[in-house]
């Protein structure tokens, strides 16, 4: 399964300005793309698998009905880096967190230095490992070291209610390799290749709560494998959230997508690799597009003027 790749994790963000500051100034990531002009419209569907971020017509008042943006950030191109997809709905101010997303771990002494310089809260949870939070409460673990590899992002940790059941799903059905397993601590580290970001499954008691802030992890595989993957899930009576579909992006590649859910309801997007590589190329204007979008965003003022709070997700 080495042809499969870990791509990105989708976060819902309520404060786009502070979120951009965290990813750019604290972590040191670059803006890969910002799909403001193309996708900020009611009913738009992102070929990066964030269609669930759409807002219904009656969610909040004009002029922000259904208006949202998507920004990709990372330490390098998504071809060989694990990145974050930040989805922002203009009419939503915050999202309730569950216990499903447990954190992203990255190795970057520069990020630790940046956080200290900017007085961004850090808590040392192990020797040389610092816990911090992105706006919205999403946890990040910063290892105070730098690796020779190009991508500092080491792993994404998700909560599971039954580790063995989850391992059967992720390994036997999705083809991931077990890199580490600790029965006593109820954790396992999985991946598709040694040089890719890993997926860590951590057992929790009392079940997995996705709340409103639930995200989605995305992978790619050769496009020809997608129908077989969908058929396998059907045969195994596993949940398919979005059957195999082609998503068009004007002026760009058409990408095939299937969206699954694991036994705990974690959303998993698989895309056809060949077209996705074309679609996910870095946009040199990405950072400027984000800055322009934030400068033009008067939603906070509009809601305050009309004495309306932004919705809570």
UniProtKB/Swiss-Prot annotation:
Subcellular location field: Mitochondrion
Description of how the protein assembles with itself and partners = Interacts with NUDT9.
At which residues is Phosphoserine found? 146
Q: Which GO terms describe its molecular function?
A: cadherin binding
Q: Which UniProt keywords apply?
A: Mitochondrion, Phosphoprotein, Repeat
Q: What else is known?
A: Expression is decreased in hepatocellular carcinoma samples as compared to adjacent non-cancerous liver tissues from the same patients. Transfection in hepatocellular carcinoma cells and overexpression can inhibit the cell growth.
Q: Which InterPro entries match?
A: GLOD4, GLOD4_C, Glyas_Bleomycin-R_OHBP_Dase, VOC
Could you tell me which residue ranges the VOC domain spans?
5-145, 152-273
* Positions of post-translational N6-succinyllysine modification: 288
Supply one GO CC term from the record. Answer: extracellular exosome
| Species of the source | Homo sapiens
Quick one: which gene encodes this? GLOD4
What name is this protein filed under? Glyoxalase domain-containing protein 4
Q: Which domain of life is it from?
A: Eukaryota
CDD domains to which the protein is assigned, alphabetical: GLOD4_C
User: Which tissue types show expression of this protein?
Assistant: Expressed in heart, brain, liver, kidney, pancreas and placenta. Not expressed in skeletal muscle and lung.
Q: Does the keyword Repeat apply?
A: yes
Question: Is the keyword rRNA-binding assigned to this protein?
Answer: no
Regarding protein family, the annotation reads:
Belongs to the glyoxalase I family.
């Amino acid at each position: 399964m080495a042809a499969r790749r870990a791509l990105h994790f989708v976060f819902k963000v309520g404060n786009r300005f502070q979120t951009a500051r965290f990813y750019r100034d604290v972590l040191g990531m670059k803006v890969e793309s910002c799909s403001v002009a193309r996708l900020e419209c009611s009913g738009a569907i992102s070929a990066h698998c964030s269609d669930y971020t759409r807002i219904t017509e009656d969610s909040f008042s004009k002029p922000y009905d259904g208006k949202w943006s998507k920004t990709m950030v990372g330490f390098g191109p998504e071809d060989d880096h694990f990145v974050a997809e930040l989805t922002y709905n203009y009419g939503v101010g915050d999202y309730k967190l569950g216990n499903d997303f447990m954190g992203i771990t990255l190795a970057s002494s520069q990020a630790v230095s940046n956080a200290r310089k900017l007085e961004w809260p850090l808590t040392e949870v192990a020797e040389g490992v610092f816990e911090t939070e992105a706006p919205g409460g999403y946890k990040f673990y910063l290892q105070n070291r730098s690796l020779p590899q190009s991508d500092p992002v080491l792993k994404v940790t998700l909560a599971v209610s039954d580790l063995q059941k989850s391992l059967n799903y992720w390994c036997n059905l999705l083809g991931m390799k077990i890199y580490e397993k600790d029965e006593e601590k109820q954790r396992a580290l999985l991946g598709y290749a040694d040089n890719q970001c890993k997926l860590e499954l951590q057992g929790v008691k009392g079940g997995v709560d996705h709340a409103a802030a639930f995200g989605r992890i995305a992978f790619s595989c050769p496009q020809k494998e997608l129908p077989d993957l969908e058929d396998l899930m059907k045969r195994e009576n596993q949940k398919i959230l979005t059957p195999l579909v082609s998503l068009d992006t004007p002026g760009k590649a058409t990408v095939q997508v299937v969206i699954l859910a694991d036994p705990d309801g974690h959303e998993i997007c698989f895309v056809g690799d060949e077209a996705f590589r074309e679609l996910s190329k870095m946009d040199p204007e990405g950072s400027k597009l984000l800055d322009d979008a934030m400068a033009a965003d008067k939603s906070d003022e509009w809601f305050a003027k009309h004495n309306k709070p932004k919705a809570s997700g």
